Swiss-Prot record:
Localisation: Plastid, Chloroplast
Function: Usually encoded in the trnK tRNA gene intron. Probably assists in splicing its own and other chloroplast group II introns.
GO biological process: mRNA processing; RNA splicing; tRNA processing
Species assigned in the record: Cicer arietinum
Keyword terms, alphabetized: Chloroplast, mRNA processing, Plastid, RNA-binding, tRNA processing
UniProt name for this protein: Maturase K
GO molecular function: RNA binding
GO cellular component: chloroplast
Transmembrane domains' residue ranges: none
InterPro entries reported in the protein's UniProt record: Domain_X (IPR024937), Maturase_MatK (IPR002866), Maturase_MatK_N (IPR024942)
Coiled coil: none
Gene symbol of the encoding locus: matK
Similarity comment text for this entry: Belongs to the intron maturase 2 family. MatK subfamily.
Any matching Pfam family: MatK_N
């Protein structure tokens, strides 16, 4: 405990980050304006009144300190003269300035703790969202239980601001930040409606994303500390997680929650074969030991969210299942551990034995029903999966229509090429192919059969099923044994480590 306390005392000396003067620097808002100006959705019909001016920003900030503007509710913000005629533009410029300023100390801190070569190496290894699946294939086959965790959403913006105060000691900056977010929720009430947080997240996406990610990072840092402490692992690689002002207060609160016996509690948590993966607003905790240990972690997570972050979470948000009997959703896939049983005949002297061998394999399949729902939402088929035409695209040329459908099909094929079974993927391709043909026939005011017979587009539309082989031919030489083996064995999976984000059709979770 003393060595941690000495370390925290040194860490506090690095927390003298004075961000308040940066709020009045012109280059901060100039940078925010230049970034927003590049977004087409933000600069449409801005007009002369939307031009950036540091004088306007300073006037808005000075008005935020006036007492008569502290009783404004979110419903009256549109009529409030504080924001002037361009409330959305001015508030977003200030929000972008806040986001840029608050990111500076954490960027400098992470950059100073890592060497340039380590940053480049970590970026290359973790830039793809599919990099988690090879890890799961190596680790999850040895595990038995999995907890599907839904991270609770913060009910009040004050929680997000308060977490940030644990890291940066600058009272004027946080006072100004509170005054700014006051326009979007009523700070006098403890519970804020989801509509207020939703409005704030849409109006200030960069600032809200930073605050929310920091909220998730904060609870994960405490979890990582307990996990490493219980497994007797070295903590040097996680030194950045300990730089908090109220770290010991949190730790003492954990002692109270778990019967005032911190070392005894850690013995319950001791599990070297436990793995944690977070994606979007969910996370997965997998272990090899008995369910009692998973229930201990579930109990810990619920108390952590309620006691530290004032976020109420129902026990149903954490579901504990056996990997061999239940599947879990991960980044648009359905995954489970399948038992492969095989019988081997062994002959010893004059006796013959039958030995049953059980092997575990991580099965990752394409979720056909959620994908059909996504296609139906995009007007490519109905809810039953029957392809329909896309009349919205009928004004484009034939090549543009085919190129649009091919682009969607290639993206889905590229994303789901690591699945164990390709049958569902071929069904999705078939739906897109018929939807493309019906769209072309609708454009030419003809039937599908008459259009195909007249235009002879069957060979062109075969690209819906041949682009996978073309991609593999670019990766491997055509006469290579690896490519021939992949063609012979269709069940092999290939994970492309260049996928930075998921397709909108994949985002059905």
């Amino acid at each position: 405990m003393k060595e941690y306390q000495v370390y925290l005392e040194r860490a506090r000396s690095r927390q003298q980050d004075f961000l308040y003067p940066l709020i009045f620097r012109e280059y901060i808002y100039g940078l925010a304006y230049s970034q927003n100006f590049k977004r087409s959705s933000f600069v449409e019909n801005l007009g002369y009144d939307s031009k950036y001016s540091l004088l306007i920003v300073k006037r808005l900030i000075s008005r935020m300190y006036q007492q008569n503007h502290l009783i404004i509710s979110a419903n009256d913000s549109n009529k409030n003269p504080f924001w002037g005629y361009n409330k959305n533009f001015n508030s977003q410029i200030i929000s972008e300035g806040f986001a840029i300023v608050v990111e500076i100390p954490f960027f400098l801190q992470s950059g100073s703790s890592l060497k340039e070569s380590e940053i480049i190496k970590s970026y290359k290894n973790l830039r793809s969202i599919h990099s988690v699946f090879p890890f799961l294939e190596d680790k999850f086959t040895y595990l038995n239980y999995v907890s599907d965790i839904r991270i609770p959403y913060p009910i009040h913006l004050e929680i997000l601001v308060q977490i940030l105060r644990y890291w940066v000691k600058d009272a004027p900056f946080f006072h100004l930040l509170r005054l700014f977010v006051y326009n979007f929720c009523n700070w006098n009430s403890f519970i804020t409606t989801k509509k207020s947080i939703y409005t704030f997240s849409k109006s200030n996406p960069r600032l809200f994303l930073f605050l929310y990610n920091f909220y998730v990072w904060e609870y994960e840092s405490i979890f990582l500390f307990l996990r490493n402490k219980s497994s007797h692992l070295r903590l040097k690689s996680f030194s950045v997680f300990f730089e908090r002002i109220f770290f010991y207060a949190k730790r003492e609160h954990l002692v109270e929650v778990f019967a005032k016996d911190f070392p005894y509690t850690l013995k319950f948590f001791k599990d070297p074969l436990i793995h944690y993966v977070r994606y979007q607003g969910k996370s997965i905790l997998a272990s090899r030991n008995a369910p009692i240990l998973m229930n201990k972690w579930k109990h810990y997570f619920l108390h952590l969210w309620q006691c530290f972050f004032d976020v109420w979470s129902q026990p149903g948000t954490i579901k504990i299942n056996q990997l061999s009997q239940h599947s879990f959703q991960l980044l648009g896939y359905f995954s489970n551990v399948r038992l492969n049983r095989s019988v081997v005949r062994s002959h010893m002297l004059q006796n013959t034995f039958l030995i049953e061998i059980v092997r575990k394999k991580l099965d990752i399949i394409v979720p056909i029903i959620p994908l059909i729902r996504s296609l139906a939402k995009g007007k490519f088929c109905n809810v039953l999966g029957h392809p329909i035409s896309k009349p919205v695209w009928a004004d484009s040329s034939d090549l543009d229509i085919i190129d649009r459908f091919l682009r969607i099909c290639r993206n889905l094929s590229h994303y789901y090429n690591g699945s164990s079974k390709k049958k569902s993927l071929y069904q999705i391709k078939y739906i897109l192919r018929l939807s493309c043909i019906k769209t072309l026939a609708c454009k030419h005011k003809s039937t599908v059969r008459a259009f195909l017979k007249r235009s002879g587009s069957e060979e062109l539309l075969e690209e819906f099923f041949t682009e996978e082989e073309e991609i593999l031919s670019f990766i491997f030489p055509r006469d290579s044994s690896t490519l021939q083996r992949l063609h012979r064995n269709r069940i092999n999976r290939i994970w492309y480590l260049d996928i930075l984000f998921s397709n909108d059709l994949v985002n059905h979770e």
